[in-house]
């Protein structure tokens, strides 16, 4: 690449360079993209990472790859044991300084105090002398050498272990500083396992400087991250999650105020490196990798964040409740119409003959169609198993046959209006003796007798007005759903959230949109259907 092109690429905004950087870092790694994304975000925001998982799953390789993200970064890596000494981590003592000046100084070149990227494997096996000094280094980014304090240039600390710190081990303070906690396991997918076996296992030696992170811009970003806004709606979601954690996991997952503050800064960094100047709901999903303490709390937190992605992030639960409210109003209106218009049988005062059951369908006011009577289905429905797509609006029955019908489960011969094909229809009465026909799904569809006298306009008009109002309310909800979905679409090109989590949000919008469209269609059909019941 010509020098000028390389320089132009290096100066490109970081959110444009990061996809290339992540792609380069992940080359040859399988099912480790989430760990790389989260590790890089922690590196970019100056936080620490804890990798938890069994041996031999590329924890150290990920740490080495993350080191390559920084241009000319100094790297320190060490495998802790119970016998590790501070000299092996922080540098040996200077014999010369001790002899000549009587000073207790360490030679730190090549050791942790002068490294930008640090990887400490089997971290919990280190002794108290190492861990106490490390805790100070993480907290203050300072290292005391002799009688003076020296700044530590550490940008990223990656620790790893195949176990969690034991309870009451005195390691809680250090563990609390490991903000990003990543659970790793063996490669699971067959194709990835095959590709891993076929690969040579060689890691990158170098990345082009054009995609790497340079020291001066890294320092600038730290100030810009702090200027990212946290909108009130996102704060409310955070507070809601905090309340939920306190109520459900208070005994197994204590989250300190310091940890909350650092986690919020991490999501601000996520917003910044995605090219935004304020936090978005999707950024909050990163809490799933910051707030758990052990395996049980991790599982519970994942369930909470799954619920968050489906219900809360983009007001899905609020819109679902509004949709349910509209459904209830529509259901009540349909019940009101059915009670007023549905043909109602009555009990006979006395009866004769073997078939009499004391029930009579009043047909005296039926509009005359020769020897036939017409019934409108209050809601058009599929009644013919041979043609399930065809919706029947009106059924025709022989008056004489209908007058001898009784509700014993026997089918009655009839046919759809305009279709000479006879069918057998199962009529039923509800508890209030209102007449219904069973559709193919055996749902009860109210039947409205076509009478001589039309339905009074004073009866139809309020129903029409109520349906018009329902349509308007559904339209407002549809606009809000569209607004929230557009907001999500602007956010979903996310560098640090896996596709699985984005799909959950997408699925929730799909269900909401589908159900709302169906409700609007049903209301519109009823709005058009009511005047036809007089035909």
Label the predicted regions:
Residues 4-15, 28-29, 182-255, 276-277:
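Conserved C-terminal "switch" segment of AAA+ ATPases
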Residues 299-535:
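Terminal-proximal interaction/regulatory segments of ATP-powered molecular machines
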Residues 227-229, 243-314:
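C-terminal helical "lid" subdomain and adjoining coupling/linker elements of P-loop NTPases
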Residues 81-100:
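Conserved NTP-binding/hydrolysis module of P-loop NTPases
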Residues 96-101, 117, 122-130, 138-212:
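Canonical AAA+ ATPase core
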């Amino acid at each position: 690449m010509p020098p000028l092109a390389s320089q132009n690429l290096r100066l490109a905004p970081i959110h444009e360079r990061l996809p290339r950087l992540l792609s380069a870092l992940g080359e040859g790694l399988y099912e480790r993209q989430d760990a790389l994304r989260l590790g890089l975000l922690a590196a970019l925001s100056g936080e620490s990472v804890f990798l938890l998982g069994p041996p031999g799953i590329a924890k150290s390789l990920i740490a080495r790859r993350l080191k390559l993200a920084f241009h000319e970064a100094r790297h320190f890596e060490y495998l802790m044991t119970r016998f590790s000494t501070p000299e092996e981590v922080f540098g040996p003592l200077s014999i010369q300084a001790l002899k000549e000046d009587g000073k207790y100084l360490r030679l730190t070149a090549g050791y942790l105090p002068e490294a930008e990227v640090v990887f400490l494997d089997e971290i919990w096996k280190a002794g108290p002398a190492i861990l106490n000094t490390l805790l100070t280094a993480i907290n203050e980014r300072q290292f005391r050498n002799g009688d003076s304090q020296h700044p530590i240039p550490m940008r990223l600390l990656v620790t790893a272990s195949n176990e969690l710190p034991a309870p009451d081990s005195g390691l809680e303070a250090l563990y609390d500083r490991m903000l990003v906690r990543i659970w790793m396991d063996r490669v699971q997918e067959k194709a990835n396992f095959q590709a891993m076996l076929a690969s040579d296992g060689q890691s990158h030696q170098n990345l082009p400087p054009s995609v790497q992170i340079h020291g001066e811009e890294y320092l600038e970003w730290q100030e810009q991250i702090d200027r990212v806004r946290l909108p009130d709606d996102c704060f409310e979601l955070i507070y809601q999650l905090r309340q939920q954690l306190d109520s459900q996991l208070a005994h197994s997952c204590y989250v300190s105020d310091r940890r909350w503050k650092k986690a919020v800064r991490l999501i601000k960094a996520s917003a910044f490196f995605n090219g935004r100047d304020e936090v978005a709901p999707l950024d909050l999903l990163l809490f799933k990798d910051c707030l758990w303490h052990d395996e049980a709390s991790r599982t519970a937190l994942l369930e909470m964040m799954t619920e968050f992605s489906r219900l809360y992030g983009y007001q899905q639960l609020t819109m679902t409740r509004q949709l349910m409210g509209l459904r209830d109003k529509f259901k009540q209106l349909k019940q009101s119409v059915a009670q007023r218009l549905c043909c109602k049988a009555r009990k006979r005062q006395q009866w004769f003959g073997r078939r009499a059951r004391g029930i009579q369908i009043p047909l005296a006011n039926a509009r005359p169609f020769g020897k036939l009577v017409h019934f409108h289905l209050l809601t058009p429905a599929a009644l013919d198993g041979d043609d399930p797509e065809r919706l029947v609006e009106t059924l025709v029955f022989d008056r004489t046959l209908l007058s001898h019908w009784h509700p014993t489960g026997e089918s009655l011969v009839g046919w759809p209006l305009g279709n000479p094909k006879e069918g057998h229809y199962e009529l039923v009465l509800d508890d209030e003796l209102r007449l219904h026909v069973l559709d193919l799904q055996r749902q009860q569809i109210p039947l409205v007798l076509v009478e001589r006298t039309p339905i009074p306009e004073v009866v139809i008009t309020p129903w029409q007005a109520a349906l018009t109002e329902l349509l308007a309310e559904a339209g407002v909800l549809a606009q809000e759903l569209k607004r929230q979905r557009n907001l999500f679409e602007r956010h979903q090109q996310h560098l640090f959230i896996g596709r699985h989590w984005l799909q959950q949000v997408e699925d929730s919008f799909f269900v909401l949109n589908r159900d709302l469209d169906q409700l609007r269609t049903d209301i519109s059909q009823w709005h058009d259907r009511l005047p036809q019941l007089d035909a």
